[in-house]
A protein has these predicted regions:
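Transmembrane alpha-helices of multi-pass inner-membrane enzymes
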Residues: 2-11, 33, 113-117, 443-456, ...
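Aromatic-anchored transmembrane helix interface
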Residues: 56-58, 108-109, 150, 154-157, ...
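N-terminal signal-anchor transmembrane segment
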Residues: 1-8, 14-123, 163-167, 453-455, ...
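Membrane-interface helix-loop-helix junctions at transmembrane boundaries of multi-pass membrane enzymes
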Residues: 72-80, 118-152, 272-287, 319-328, ...
């Protein structure tokens, strides 16, 4: 565990390409080995071990796919970042240890292919001069300090998670969190900081994200029309049968995760519209955002709507000033209060703690139980990945044992020690992504999406174990590092014109 997380941490901190990619390779190889050891005696893995031919065929297929992807990314430099963001939310149900886990299999393949491509370009004798760390890695002293602390805190998060697995109440879950989420996402962060981000490339990412969002929205509309779900038909389908409304989850296992990614896409489009000139492209972006908003409404995800509002207010603050954002926030609160009073929803669903707990799917009990867990072990916590197991053993058995709040999860699992890393990480991350974000649509989009992501994690947890956090930090770290603008023609006039003349072009593009 320490080898996998430690390797990823070294990859984040290292400046020497040989050390960086060597450590990253160790992390990526050890992680699946950890998972294999964790599920060694499960029926499915025993079956694979008894059939070496099937196991060899599976490994060969993965290797061929990674090699093909690496070759493609080598020939098409923009392929890795655009593809990574396009597949960022795609999860496939996989049987792990007798349970169904929704894993980011497409993203894992993209990360592995990108790692192979970048490592070859950095280390191969003939390719050594073809790729160098972008100029954004040599910023001014003030920016360098913030970026350095960001990298240190991310590395500390990985190492601490590995150490606190030693006494975890659920070692198996900790291994899965590290191997399936923390380690590959840390490697993705490293790769994204290697990319020379240009306005053209960022425009391509926005188009890809919006396109994937439209596909997800279309699936959600089909589910709503058919009153049926394509994936994760268990508890959610039963819940839909008990309520007057019908929640869709598209190709996601959870409507809240579906809503999270729709909210992020809408915020990114809003940032583009805030800086764009002309009529055609902004109108098109607005139409796409409207479709995504309609799909978001069908998720009935309160947390996602709150995150969306936070992200949009961040866009307003960066584009027109904090005063307008505060006014917009006050208007939203006033409209919400009027709605609750007129509709009677506040009295019916939120009038008592019991009703509020029922309306929020048991989150009140989970949060209260999480706070009790923090109080029982305030210094070192119950160990990495242990919230569910500790809650079931020491609080009560429940269908859902996730705190739905990242700070409470960190406090319960890792105690005050973990919070000493988590809180500074949040603060430094905000400093990095917000610094200079008002200069361009690109910086504003990354910063506002990060704010939305952070707010969503306060109501639904999953922050460091969500690839969007690491991806936004990877791009934000480069955009925050000023450098001379490149001499290039943007992909489209719409993307090129996103920043009006009074504002300088973004530092890293």
């Amino acid at each position: 565990m320490l080898l996998a997380c430690g390797g990823a941490a070294v990859a984040i901190l290292a400046r020497d390409p040989r050390l960086r990619y060597g450590a990253g390779a160790v992390a990526l190889v050890v992680s699946p080995a950890l998972v294999a050891g964790n599920v060694w005696d499960t029926a499915r893995f025993v079956e694979l071990r008894r059939d070496p031919a099937e196991l060899a065929a599976l490994i060969a297929a993965v290797a061929v796919g990674v090699a093909a992807g690496a070759a493609l990314f080598h020939r098409v430099p923009w392929g890795f970042p655009v593809t990574a963001f396009a597949v960022l939310p795609l999860r496939l149900p996989v049987q792990i240890g007798g349970q169904t886990s929704h894993l980011l299999v497409p993203l894992y393949l993209v990360i592995a292919a990108g790692f192979a491509c970048f490592a070859y370009q950095a280390l191969a004798p003939r390719q050594r001069g073809a790729r160098s760390r972008p100029d954004g890695r040599s910023p001014s002293p003030g920016d360098r300090s913030a970026l350095t602390w960001l990298e240190r805190l991310l590395a500390a998060t990985l190492v601490l998670y590995a150490i606190q697995t030693a006494y975890s109440a659920d070692v198996s879950n900790a291994i899965e969190n590290a191997a399936f989420f923390l380690v590959p996402f840390a490697v993705m962060f490293v790769l994204l900081t290697e990319v020379s981000w240009t306005r053209r490339l960022l425009g391509g990412v926005l188009i890809a994200v919006a396109g994937v969002g439209l596909v997800f929205a279309a699936v959600g509309f089909v589910e709503y029309a058919a009153r049926d779900l394509l994936l994760s038909r268990g508890e959610l389908l039963q819940s839909n049968q008990l309520h007057l409304y019908f929640r869709v989850n598209s190709l996601f296992y959870d409507p809240n995760i579906f809503g999270r990614y729709l909210a992020l896409a809408i915020v990114a489009l809003a940032a583009y519209m805030g800086w764009a000139r002309g009529v055609g492209a902004p109108v098109l972006a607005g139409a796409v955002a409207g479709i995504l908003l309609a799909a978001l409404a069908l998720t009935y995800s309160i947390t996602s709507f709150v995150a969306l509002v936070a992200g949009l207010l961040a866009v307003v603050a960066l584009r027109w000033g904090l005063r307008w954002a505060l006014g917009g926030g006050a208007a939203v609160l006033a409209c919400g209060a009027v709605f609750l009073l007129v509709s009677g929803t506040g009295k019916a669903d939120l009038g008592s703690a019991k009703n509020f707990d029922t309306t929020t799917s048991g989150r009140v009990d989970l949060v209260q139980g999480g706070i009790r867990l923090v109080g029982d072990r305030p210094v070192w916590g119950w160990g990495s990945g242990s919230f569910g197991a500790a809650f079931s053993r020491h609080i009560e058995r429940a269908k859902t044992t996730v705190s739905h709040s990242e700070p409470i999860t960190v406090g319960a699992e890792q105690g005050g020690i973990g919070l000493l890393v988590y809180v500074p990480l949040v603060v430094v991350s905000l400093i990095v992504v917000l610094r200079g974000a008002a200069r361009s649509a690109e910086g504003a989009a990354v910063a506002s999406c990060f704010v939305a992501m952070l707010v969503h994690s306060l109501g639904y947890a999953v922050w460091t174990t969500d690839p969007a956090t690491w991806a936004l930090l990877g791009v934000g770290a480069i955009l925050a590092a000023p450098r001379a603008p490149p001499d290039e023609v943007p992909a489209t006039h719409a993307v090129a014109d996103a920043t009006p003349p009074p504002h300088p072009r973004p530092a890293a593009v």
